Amino acid sequence: MASKISQTPEKQPSTAYDPLSIETRWQQSWKEQGLYKTKEPTKSQKTFYALSMFPYPSGTLHMGHVRNYVITDVIARLHRMKGDSVLHPMGWDAFGLPAENAAIERGIPADIWTYKNIEDMRNQLNRLGLSIDWDKEVTTCKEEYYKWTQYIFLELYEAGLAYQKSATVNWDPIDKTVLANEQVDANGRSWRSGALVEKKKLKQWFLKITDFADELLEDIELLSGWPQNVKTMQQNWIGRSNGTEIDFYIKGKNNIFITVFTTRPDTLHGTEYLVLAPDHELINSIIDKNKITELEQFRTEISILTDQERTSDGNNKRGMFLGCHAINPINKKIIPIWVGEYVLSSYATGAVMGVPAHDKRDYKFAKKYSLPIQYVIKSPSQEASDLEASSAYVKEGIMINSGEFNGINSKEAGFMITKLGVKQGWAKNKVTYKLRDWLISRQRMWGCPIPIIYCPDCGSVPVKREELPVKLTNPSVIGKSQENKNNIPIMKCSKCNKDSILETDTMDTFMCSSWYFLRYIDVENNKLPFTKTEVDKWLPVDQYVGGIEHAILHLLYSRFLIKALRNRGLLNIKEPFSNLLTQGMVQGVTFKNPKTSKYISPDHINDINTPLDPETGEPLDVLYEKMSKSKYNGVDPASVIDKYGTDTARMFILFKAPPEKDLEWDESDVEGQYRFLNRLWRIVIYSIETKDINISNCTQEILLNDLSDKERKLIKVLNNTIKEVTNDLVNDFQFNTAISELMILCNSIYENIDDCGDYIVTETFKKLTLLLAPFAPHIAEEFWIKLKGKGSVHENSWPTYDPKALLEDSYKLIIQINGKVRGNISVNHEDSELELKNKALACETTQKWLNGIEPKRIIIVKGKIINIVF
């Protein structure tokens, strides 16, 4: 029988679903109640720290923000209902290039621009119905925050982890600042401005992240709650290589040698040349003087290339013979020394041995410059005479052309050659890393000042802690750092009290964001950035949610900082984030001309189903791509909320795709979630108006034997929904399948409600509302109050399921006679032991075997067997 509510249009609730009215009212109520303020945990209570990566305050939320924050909010709400003391804070990553550039473009001071954007975005976030504790808010550009960033810098400085040196750095010519290696993409462009990065020699501040390379690598094993791809990215970025350093002495230069690092000492006999980085420190000492002009020209040509361009496999690499030679230590062969664009001074020793027979890049280089190619390893199935110089053999094999090592497996030979070199003094075992120290100097004004002064007598001197914060020179400045530093700030030297110049560079904004999660837990502390007690209570973060683009930036820096601060005795934890969820992108539909690569606004397309370029009439490609203004595929969250309501927007974001996958925006699916909530509204509110429903009276146990078939069916679906939704949220974060389960429950309510008693309906609505609360908090709160629930739905306990309700009505009970199986009977789960005995004794099989004999014993294993002994 179909539900009367769905069957008869006149039986509709007296009030229609009005999401904007409901959501505005409840958001104001939650704020006034302080509902989401972090509560001090009791002795028996678990803590749960739910954290989204905090945003740069651009002024406008986009759908990527919405997805991130809603995912975290569902997790926070679930754990609050499960009885945990939950910390769910929010803040602002407010320093940096975008704010300064936006201020320049608009003629607005950076601080005014930033604080206005924060206010706007806070209001937008509040419309999402997030359970954020705003009392914990942090803003990195405020003195009360960056004072402690400077404090942490001084801790690193005192530990010898912050130092200054002249270095060739990545220079962004548009933003006019230095970039860390991690901030340059694979195409050699700035991750912010998109400019091709240049090389400059500047004096810069660095942090010794390399001191923690092994620990950062080894402790990845502790991160069982992180996605494997993120862990792999960090492992590759750290790039540990176990190998050998080999010294090649220079012919005709007493006691001058070039050290190379190799992971393939087995190929040493095949070394035909050495290649040095263009800025290798020994070049000027060994070069043929007639080659100096040519070298300078070569260096000029190379200087315009990025490291990525120099080391990529895409093209034949340029080189230049230096007019000098080295001596191969293992066979005394004289080999030429070259300089090559593909060798970087920043990696290992800045010199490599050229083994063209066994390295693809060396092979291309040798072919280009007609250098000899000598094979020293062959495949076990190949004859040495069959080898041709047509490609590099890069696998393991059998040694050839290698003197005493001929015939030995190449891997074993590598160990033997290293051992020989160590014994003779020209080799040693060595571990190297791709990881480089973290360059934190930025030539900008809108950033955290570095607390260092330059005294004419004492040199570099750290500012005293009691003098922190070193304030921004002029927080309302408009313009770029180096162009506006007309008034260099002066401070007294803490050692000799002389007037000294304050460091004018500011810190990389990742310095501010590498510890912000620590400040949330102790935000009112004006004596320390945080205390050990609070860190022990709340850290590590239980669930961190953010984009995978931060895998080797923020996430690696945060791990480093935690380890450095642990060594300083400031905290006890080893890792900052126990579990990490990297949500996929939100993609919108784009219309692109495949010939011109030009994106066309949908407003300029006459027929969306058959899209054509309005200028050329050419067919357009229809694609889903990351939302962007330039691609005309962005969707304003505010417009969606205005049209459908916050709960609908949340439900769509959670339902459309698993959280780790990309989400394709489709307004028809948004409408589908609106229809679902509207349907729930009609059934719940109409039932409240026509039935005796008061969930405060739901105190008695539901006896399954007393239920009608329809009631039993509904209760079974309800309990299965509780089980599945809980599993989806707690174990897998499969929000989409959890919402599907709620839809199944809704359908079951429609099918069965007219034949169910008020108490069953009340129990169903109570648990449905609790299950709905993390996903659609406003409509759930409205249901809860109308159902006469106590307090807020969000302060009530998460429901648990009754396993008995999931069982089939009957099951087969095996009958044993004197321990042997003789048959089975159909019984009900609710049958008592007496009822089971009577049914077993009454069945034909039992009577046949007993043949009138009275049983001595009857043993029952409920749900399985009954054993009758006579």
From Swiss-Prot:
Residue window of motif 'HIGH' region: 55-65
Keyword Protein transport among record annotations: no
EC number: 6.1.1.4
InterPro entries, sorted: aa-tRNA-synth_I_CS, aa-tRNA-synth_Ia, Leu-tRNA-ligase, Leu_tRNA-synth_edit, M/V/L/I-tRNA-synth_anticd-bd, Methionyl/Leucyl_tRNA_Synth, Rossmann-like_a/b/a_fold, tRNAsynth_Ia_anticodon-bd
Residues reported to bind ATP: K629
Locus of motif 'KMSKS' region: 626-630
Domain of life of the source: Bacteria
Primary localization: cytoplasm
A Gene Ontology cellular-component term: cytosol
Gene Ontology biological-process annotations: leucyl-tRNA aminoacylation
Keywords: Aminoacyl-tRNA synthetase, ATP-binding, Cytoplasm, Ligase, Nucleotide-binding, Protein biosynthesis
The keyword ATP-binding is annotated on this UniProt entry: yes
Recorded catalytic activity of this chain's protein: tRNA(Leu) + L-leucine + ATP = L-leucyl-tRNA(Leu) + AMP + diphosphate
Database matches in CDD domains: Anticodon_Ia_Leu_BEm (cd07958), LeuRS_core (cd00812)
Listed GO MF terms: aminoacyl-tRNA deacylase activity; ATP binding; leucine-tRNA ligase activity
Subcellular location, record wording: Cytoplasm
Family: Belongs to the class-I aminoacyl-tRNA synthetase family.
Family matches, as NCBIfam families: leuS_bact
UniProt protein name: Leucine--tRNA ligase
Organism annotation: Prochlorococcus marinus (strain SARG / CCMP1375 / SS120)
Gene (UniProt): leuS
